[in-house]
Amino acid sequence: MLAKRIIPCLDVRDGQVVKGVQFRNHEIIGDIVPLAKRYAEEGADELVFYDITASSDGRTVDKSWVERVAEVIDIPFCVAGGIKTIADAEQIFAFGADKISINSPALADPNLITALADRFGVQAIVVGIDSWFEKETGKYWVNQYTGDESRTRQTNWQLLDWVKEVQQRGAGEIVLNMMNQDGVRNGYDLVQLKKVREVCKVPLIASGGAGETVHFRDAFVEANVDGALAASVFHKQIINIGELKAYLTKEGVEIRR
């Protein structure tokens, strides 16, 4: 069995790390590079950086900080935000990123997934999916342009259909951002994760809802995800990554040292 991954997520806006609740009301957390360095030193397995307004602003990720991050950390990192072309991706890889993640641009042009996977290999291409649970209908929908509250919209894709589609097109990994849980810290949506796990044959990363160490354990043990992504519990030092890994090891979860 592959070891499970602990992945801090850094949402970036205007050169700063920010964090919201359910993708809204973002507060500034701090500077990108010192936070990245701290997480690497604490034992994070990789980092994910989302330039959250790039797609909604119609631009690509601000690359000025990508190179600076690559200089100070020695763990893999993934960059997302408005990547719409092979050239966009080439630049980000050239600055030192190990993976790229696409979300809204993939919804706008699903062929982009295949083009990027063919050019850089599936292992380097992550598809981020922002899901929203509609309580009235019991359906899970895929949302687009979630970095900007005023532009966020529900697509016509139901979650499981889109998960299947992106795999067929060459996604090497899926990060499921469960919007209802985001920043609330009451646990990952295990029901949703289990449904996605059934149809997801590539590595699946859970995102949205971590508040306590047991939430990570539940995602790994009950939903069998490959990685757990979290932001606010790490940013606010509610959970220390080293202590989290020690707890998971004690719980019998195989974790990277």
Curated annotation (Swiss-Prot):
It comes from the Bacteria. InterPro entries: Aldolase_TIM, His_biosynth, HisF, IGPS_HisA/HisF, RibuloseP-bd_barrel. One of its GO terms (molecular function) is lyase activity. The active site is at 11, 130. Pfam families: His_biosynth. Its EC number is 4.3.2.10. It catalyses: 5-[(5-phospho-1-deoxy-D-ribulos-1-ylimino)methylamino]-1-(5-phospho-beta-D-ribosyl)imidazole-4-carboxamide + L-glutamine = D-erythro-1-(imidazol-4-yl)glycerol 3-phosphate + 5-amino-1-(5-phospho-beta-D-ribosyl)imidazole-4-carboxamide + L-glutamate + H(+). GO terms for biological process: L-histidine biosynthetic process. The keyword Glycoprotein does not apply. Pathway: Amino-acid biosynthesis; L-histidine biosynthesis; L-histidine from 5-phospho-alpha-D-ribose 1-diphosphate: step 5/9. It is found in: Cytoplasm. Keywords: Amino-acid biosynthesis, Cytoplasm, Histidine biosynthesis, Lyase. GO terms for cellular component: cytoplasm. The keyword Cell cycle does not apply. Belongs to the HisA/HisF family. IGPS catalyzes the conversion of PRFAR and glutamine to IGP, AICAR and glutamate. The HisF subunit catalyzes the cyclization activity that produces IGP and AICAR from PRFAR using the ammonia provided by the HisH subunit. Heterodimer of HisH and HisF. NCBIfam families: hisF. This is Imidazole glycerol phosphate synthase subunit HisF. It comes from Actinobacillus succinogenes (strain ATCC 55618 / DSM 22257 / CCUG 43843 / 130Z).
